């Protein structure tokens, strides 16, 4: 695939990917913000913490499960993270079950349809949306799951490896929270802090995606 990319006009939705294509493969690309559609939503109750990305190696779901187990042990069952998303069975079996002895099923709420109604149902109760993605040669910018969470009033909790790029639009304790491991995540979820100002700051990230020409 890489050998043939020179024949096409390439568009990337994150600056890190654009840079990687150029420096690694000498492939030019154009960076464009991905557009966002303002679908109908219900008022956010802010009662839960959710994780909605794939359950996979680069998503670090094990950190979330470890944090949940600690929270339960400390009597904070109401603060655990509900986990949604498609499973990578290899990750679940080899990493979670065999290597780490972690039980995803204790917190797994299943998949949801990729439509606005189901998306709204999951996010309408979410005070926090946890996405611990850390992908080699990627990060710093946004993705659809981030924008959906911001749009519905859920504050993002992100992996520090995602935002370590100096050009990242995400700033810890300004428009998101940043954690490096389960201990950081536990501390944050135990506090269950007020996020009104942070939610408003995050909304500013959404605005450029509402008027994008492709």
Name these PLM-found stretches.
Residues 40-69, 82:
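Conserved donor-binding/catalytic core segment of Leloir-type glycosyltransferases
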Residues 131-147, 159-168:
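Nucleotide-sugar-dependent
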Residues 16-17, 26, 30-42, 55, ...:
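Short beta-strand->alpha-helix junction loop in the catalytic core
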Residues 1-29:
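A short, active-site helix/loop in glycosyltransferases that binds the activated sugar's phosphate group
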Residues 77-96:
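Glycosyltransferase donor-sugar binding loop
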Residues 121-139, 154:
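Acidic donor-binding loop of glycosyltransferase active sites
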Residues 93-120:
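Nucleotide-activated donor-binding/catalytic signature segment of Leloir-type glycosyltransferases, i.e.
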Residues 180, 189, 193-214:
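A charged, aromatic-enriched C-terminal amphipathic alpha-helix characteristic of glycosyltransferases
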């Amino acid at each position: 695939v890489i050998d043939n990319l020179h024949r096409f006009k390439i568009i990337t939705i994150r600056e890190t990917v654009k840079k990687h294509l150029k420096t690694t493969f000498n492939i030019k690309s154009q960076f464009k913000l991905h557009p966002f559609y303002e679908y109908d939503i219900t008022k956010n109750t802010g009662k839960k913490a959710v994780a909605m990305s794939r359950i996979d190696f680069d998503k670090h779901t094990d950190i979330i499960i470890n944090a949940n187990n600690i929270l339960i042990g400390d009597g904070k069952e109401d603060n655990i993270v509900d986990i949604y998303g498609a499973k990578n069975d290899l990750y679940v079996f080899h990493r979670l079950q065999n290597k780490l002895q972690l039980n995803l099923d204790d917190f797994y709420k299943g998949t949801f349809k990729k439509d606005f109604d189901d998306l709204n149902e999951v996010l309408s109760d979410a005070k926090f949306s946890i996405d611990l993605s850390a992908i080699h040669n990627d990060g710093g910018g946004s993705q659809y799951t981030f924008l959906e969470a911001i749009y519905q009033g859920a504050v993002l909790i992100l992996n520090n490896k995602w935002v370590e790029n100096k050009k990242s639009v995400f700033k810890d304790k300004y428009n998101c929270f940043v954690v490096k491991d389960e201990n950081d995540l536990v501390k944050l979820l135990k506090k269950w802090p007020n996020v009104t100002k942070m939610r408003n700051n995050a909304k500013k990230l959404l605005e450029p995606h509402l008027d994008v020409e492709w």
